């Protein structure tokens, strides 16, 4: 890719993103995975070649999706797959030189150094390439990137719930209608539940599922958006194109105000009706950052362990095999770290940022 003009990389990234999105729109359940991978090419373009290339990628994907899938599909693609990555990458590429020389100082220095290298290669300037050391800069904190991603996921969730309050039974009723494709009326679901020994009516079972779907969808979007950003960064590091250094998960930290929102949402969960439904759904989404904080605590404290690699391998194996239980325990560890400062106690040499 090094010989391609940057705008071509942006166009190719947009083409790849729109192709993944179109493949996921086919309706097959396994293809849904492609929907969550759709922002990955845009993240690669932005974190490797700058925000303008991400904008070109997003614009290309929007045009192609609108042309082949319709304007409404293009609007959804823009809102869910493009807007958030563009904003998150703009934040991720923000840096400030130590000493106050202004924002994005590292990016400006990198562009100047690259221009100097091109001039030397073209014979416009005599002498070797400029090998001045990188300026000392501070980058946008990873914790704030998680906060912004969580805020976007929570906003999409609340908009979905509020927009359906005028309909009968709200968002849960709409989801029940969508997943009830005759399986209740034909008695098929009832037979399956009876065969498995569940003492619950088919409609009550569907109502329970409908209550979990919004929070599950928002949580999965949050996790996959952060995962796409991380995977894009790892790919770019391997290619030598990463525009910023890779942050350490052990140094993750959130603002105190953000930490207070989770207990507030738990209080709303006890309210009746749609308010309680919104509070419970929001609490589920806001628990994800605490899960990440729990991972940060484990990585920080384990730095002193002699068999750290084996311990982390065993932990992540347990996380995969016993996913829900271990995830909840890790989230509780994150809660304890947020309010009790476990990393400051057991990893005092760690610079938490």
Regions found by a protein language model. Give the residues of each.
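Hydrophobic transmembrane alpha-helices
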Residues: 1-57, 306-320, 325
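Membrane-interface interhelical loops and short interface/amphipathic helices
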Residues: 100-139, 146-149, 153-210
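Hydrophobic alpha-helical transmembrane segments
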Residues: 7-15, 55-59, 74-79, 145-146, ...
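Membrane-water interface at loop-to-transmembrane-helix junctions
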Residues: 135-143, 204-219, 244-264
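Alpha-helical membrane segments and adjacent membrane-interface helices in multi-pass membrane proteins
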Residues: 30-90, 333-340
């Amino acid at each position: 890719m090094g010989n391609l003009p940057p705008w071509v990389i942006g166009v190719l990234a947009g083409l790849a993103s729109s192709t993944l999105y179109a493949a996921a729109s086919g309706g097959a359940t396994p293809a849904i995975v492609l929907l969550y991978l759709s922002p990955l090419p845009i993240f690669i373009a932005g974190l490797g070649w700058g925000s303008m290339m991400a904008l070109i990628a997003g614009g290309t994907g929007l045009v192609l999706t609108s042309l082949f899938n319709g304007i409404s599909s293009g609007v959804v693609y823009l809102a869910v797959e493009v807007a958030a990555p563009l904003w998150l990458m703009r934040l991720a590429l923000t840096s400030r030189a130590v000493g106050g020389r202004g924002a994005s100082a590292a990016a400006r220095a990198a562009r100047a150094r690259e221009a100097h290298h091109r001039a030397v290669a073209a014979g416009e300037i005599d002498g070797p390439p400029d090998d001045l050391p990188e300026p000392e800069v501070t980058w946008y904190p990873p914790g704030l990137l998680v906060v912004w991603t969580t805020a976007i996921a929570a906003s999409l969730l609340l908009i979905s719930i509020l927009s359906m309050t005028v309909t009968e039974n709200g968002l849960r009723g709409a989801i029940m209608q969508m997943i009830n494709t005759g399986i209740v009326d034909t008695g098929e679901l009832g037979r399956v539940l009876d065969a498995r020994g569940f003492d619950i009516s088919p409609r009550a079972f569907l109502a329970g599922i409908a209550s979990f779907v919004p929070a599950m969808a928002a949580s999965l979007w949050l996790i996959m958006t952060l995962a796409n950003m991380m995977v894009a960064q790892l790919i770019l590091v391997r290619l030598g194109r990463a525009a910023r250094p890779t942050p350490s998960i052990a140094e993750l930290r959130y603002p105190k105000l953000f930490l207070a929102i989770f207990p507030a949402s738990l209080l709303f969960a006890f309210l009746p009706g749609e308010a309680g439904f919104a509070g419970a759904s929001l609490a589920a989404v806001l628990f994800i950052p605490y899960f990440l904080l729990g991972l940060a605590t484990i990585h920080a404290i384990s730095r002193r362990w002699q068999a750290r690699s084996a311990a982390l391998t065993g932990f992540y194996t347990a996380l995969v095999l016993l996913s829900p239980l271990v995830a909840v325990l890790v989230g509780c560890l994150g809660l304890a770290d947020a309010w009790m400062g476990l990393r400051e106690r057991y990893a005092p040499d760690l610079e938490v940022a």
